[in-house]
Structure formats: structure tokens, C-alpha cells
Amino acid sequence: MAFEFRLPDIGEGIHEGEIVKWFIKAGDTIEEDDVLAEVQNDKSVVEIPSPVSGTVEEVLVDEGTVAVVGDVIVKIDAPDAEEMQFKGHGDDEDSKKEEKEQESPVQEEASSTQSQEKTEVDESKTVKAMPSVRKYARENGVNIKAVNGSGKNGRITKEDIDAYLNGGSSEEGSNTSVASESTSSDVVNASATQALPEGDFPETTEKIPAMRKAIAKAMVNSKHTAPHVTLMDEIDVQELWDHRKKFKEIAAEQGTKLTFLPYVVKALVSALKKYPALNTSFNEEAGEVVHKHYWNIGIAADTDKGLLVPVVKHADRKSIFEISDEINELAVKARDGKLTSEEMKGATCTISNIGSAGGQWFTPVINHPEVAILGIGRIAQKPIVKDGEIVAAPVLALSLSFDHRQIDGATGQNAMNHIKRLLNNPELLLMEG
């Protein structure tokens, strides 16, 4: 019997996704839990597993096409298809409705367990599980985000739910991984690009990729919502240059690639603490300002697929070396398409580095709902006046954009001056803790 597999809700609050790459084709024999496709949403690339074993009859959605949750994307000739009818979007939605109408007795029995989970489980965590497993967890009163998956790529199975009910493993050690081959974007472009008749001015057209749509939406929303003001400045970083040179070899001995960026992260965190208005969110509709008592720094990363912003969490608690390692790891994940949505959430302020591309000053766009973004340009040798003499020194270009609804010009410049002071004399960062 043919089993119609529908694009499932992957738990990110996203209702559609672009089919980036199929790993199967008509005629292939597959096993349950084999990866069928990679789907890209606004946040990340996610692997979609098969809920059944069988033979692929037909792939219904081409690579590069956007499918909506619930759409049939592939048909599989599965011997147990009749028993598997509950798997997929439809039944999952029905079970959600049933939950709202009545509470399960099992859930009442597990209430003490659930209350404990609420204090320990990261509710924003991405879960890999089929709809049937999610339903099974709900029926047994288990928060699926507290369960450690033992399946392929950390996928959660019914056996994992049973083990959890019997006092087994929790979410500790659970990992969500996504994979994306560098050639996938080429495949999408090749399939989506259509050549028009040749002439004096030949053109081609292609569908806008999901990632580019997400970036465009975020940029337009930020510029339309927040009145941007950008301050541009520069600072002599000779001592910073020498400090990094002094510790570069020491860092390398322990496997750390030391760059200037971790220094900027620490300087920005210090500025956010001294001028907390920059570490807020401005909600005009609700009439509220959200004050954030944590310091997570987003690092804008340029990739082949577009701009991604992985986040260094609790940057105030980490050393220069630790931040350097984390930035390098996140950058590799970004380039390889392996960032999870969790690694791109929770930033309180962002850094954009145009200097790595040879740029100097620019007007970085705020990563809404944040209220500020620090842009760093290249370090260039320039003439400066020092002790009454003109000398050459390495000078760093800085650009600070902020939301003028929340931050006044003087506050923005004072924050910029504080950052300049720390980068001019990096030993002061030791005094910051």
C-alpha cells in the first residue's frame, strides 16, 4: 500500500520549508528512520527522516521548491502502510486538538515530573522525532524535550520515551545536528534557474531561496521598525595589535586561533553593562522595554547561502581564548550549513565584521528586536598625532548603529567611547573581569 508522507512540523514554529536536497529517488529501498531530504526554513537546514520502511514510489516535490507543512512530498510503498496512517501531519494536528479538549489521566499522574522538567528543560531546544513519537510522549505525559534520543542523529524513538518513563536518560547529552553539503545550493540554483531567449541583453531568473527570503524580511522589518542612527569612529589599536601578537603563539599551543574579534566582544559586553539601554528590546506595541540581564553576542557570519548570526552565549563569563574558540567553531558550522536554530537564538547585541572583507565604515542594520549593532572595519596603517608628532599606527574603523527610539545620541557615543578606550588599551579588559 502506498504511504503518503507529508512534510511534518519540525517543531520550529515554521509552517513551510524549501526542499534543499533529496537523498532518495523513485525505486530506492529505504528503512525506517533513513534520511529522506534536507529542508531549509528561516532558521536552519533540517534532515527529514522516513517513518516507514519500503520502496520509494514517487517524489512529488522538486528540489528548490517550497512545501507547506502537511503537503504530501513523497509516496512510499510500505508493507505496514495501513498501520502507519497515524504518522504525518494530519494526525499530529488532531492529537493537538484532543489535548486542548481534555486532559489525559496519565498527564495528571506525571504532573510532578512535568513541573520538575519545566525548571530544567530548555523549551527552545530542537527535537528530532516523528509525529507518532511526539503523540506517544504526550499521551504518556512526557515532555519530549527532556528525553535523550538514541536513534540515528539523536532522533527520539518510542523506546526512548519508555526508558524515560522508567527513570532513564534525560535531555542531557542530547544533540541536534543538521547537515548541508556545499553542493546543495548549486543543485538548487541549477534546477531553479531558467534561461530566457538570448539577445543583446541575456538574463536568467531563479526562485528566491528560503534563506534569502528570511534575510530580506528581517532587514526590511528592522529598517521599517527602528529609526537607525549610525556613529562612525576610529581608534589607534597599536597596543591591541601588540597584545594579540604576544599571546598568539601561546593560544596556538593550546589549539586556539586568536583573532581581534574576541577582544571586541569583551569590549562590547563591557559597554552593554555600563550603558544597559543598549542591552534591551523596545516593544512599542506593548508599551514595554525588555531589560536583559544576560549578555549574549551575535556574530554575523558571511556564508555561501547568506548572512547567518550564530550567538556566543554568556560572553561575560568567558575568557578571550574561550570566546575565540567558540567563534571559530560557530563560523565553521555556519559555512558548512550545520548551525542549529538554538545556536542562532538569544542574542542581546550583534557584531558585524566588514573588515574581514576589506571594508572600513558602513551602516550595519540592527538585528531586530535588538537595539544596537557594532560594525568593525579593517585595521589600516594611518598617520596619527602622538606626543606632538605624526606617526604611523594601526587604526581600527568602528560603526555603531542604534535604535533612536530607545537610545539617545549621547548614550550611543558614550558607549562608542567606552569601546574605543578598551580597544586602545586592552589591558583594561582584565580590570573588567
UniProtKB/Swiss-Prot annotation:
Species of provenance: Staphylococcus epidermidis (strain ATCC 12228 / FDA PCI 1200)
Disordered: annotated segments: 80-134, 164-204
EC number annotated for this UniProt entry: 2.3.1.12
Subunit description: Forms a 24-polypeptide structural core with octahedral symmetry.
Record-annotated active site: 404
GO molecular function: dihydrolipoyllysine-residue acetyltransferase activity; lipoic acid binding
Record field: compositional bias (Basic and acidic residues): 84-103, 117-126
Chain positions with N6-lipoyllysine modification: 43
Extent of Low complexity compositional bias: 166-188
Co-factor requirement: (R)-lipoate
Cofactor note: Binds 1 lipoyl cofactor covalently.
Cysteine disulfide links: none
Listed name of the protein: Dihydrolipoyllysine-residue acetyltransferase component of pyruvate dehydrogenase complex
Family: Belongs to the 2-oxoacid dehydrogenase family.
Reactions performed catalytically: N(6)-[(R)-dihydrolipoyl]-L-lysyl-[protein] + acetyl-CoA = N(6)-[(R)-S(8)-acetyldihydrolipoyl]-L-lysyl-[protein] + CoA
Alphabetical list of PROSITE patterns matching this protein: BIOTINYL_LIPOYL, LIPOYL, PSBD
Keywords: Acyltransferase, Lipoyl, Transferase
One Pfam family it belongs to: E3_binding
Annotated Gene Ontology cellular component terms: cytoplasm
Primary role: The pyruvate dehydrogenase complex catalyzes the overall conversion of pyruvate to acetyl-CoA and CO(2). It contains multiple copies of three enzymatic components: pyruvate dehydrogenase (E1), dihydrolipoamide acetyltransferase (E2) and lipoamide dehydrogenase (E3).
Domain Peripheral subunit-binding (PSBD) as annotated: residue spans: 128-165
